[in-house]
């Protein structure tokens, strides 16, 4: 399918990014980013389930809002700050079909205080990915670098990848 056509592209993209030493300190992290990009791609191409971008401190809001239309066409939605407690278990929202649980939740930053929220998402079958300056145990995929600037660039890179895929899929 379409997903396998992307594999050589993803590897080259990730390797080029790594060679520039922009956000990776090891080939292990490169492999993890490659896995995440493939997971996001497969979710967009093969699933009707949404991807949520959870931006806890609103740092990326302006950037992502510029591309809201393109991202929503492929079921990628900006959630913004953390959702209120009880949101995920509110049957009114989810059982009526008003909202669908995402397939993937992409966190711009995850701290130890958000462990329960991550676990609540995982209990609903959501794959949780996060960018941070250190490894976060509760995440399915913890993408981290040794400094915040590299972590920011990594998050922009992933969002840019989602935008690229949305333009490709919609043509």
Regions found by a protein language model. Name each.
Residues 1-170:
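Ribosome large-subunit tunnel/peptidyl-transferase-proximal elements
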């Amino acid at each position: 399918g379409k997903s396998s056509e992307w594999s050589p592209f993803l590897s080259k993209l990730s390797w080029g990014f790594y060679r520039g030493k922009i956000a990776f300190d090891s080939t292990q992290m490169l492999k993890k980013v490659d896995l995440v990009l493939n997971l996001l791609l497969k979710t967009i191409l093969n699933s009707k389930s949404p991807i949520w971008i959870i931006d806890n401190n609103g740092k990326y809001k302006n950037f992502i809002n510029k591309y809201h239309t393109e991202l929503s066409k492929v079921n990628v939605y900006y959630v913004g700050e953390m959702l209120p407690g009880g949101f995920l278990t509110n049957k009114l929202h989810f059982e009526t079909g008003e909202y669908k649980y995402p397939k993937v939740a992409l966190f711009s930053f995850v701290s130890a205080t958000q462990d329960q929220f991550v676990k609540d998402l995982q209990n609903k079958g959501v794959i949780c990915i996060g960018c941070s300056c250190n490894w976060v145990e509760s995440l399915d995929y913890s993408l981290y670098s040794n400094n915040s600037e590299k972590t920011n660039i990594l998050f922009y890179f992933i969002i840019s990848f989602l935008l690229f895929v949305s333009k490709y899929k919609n043509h």
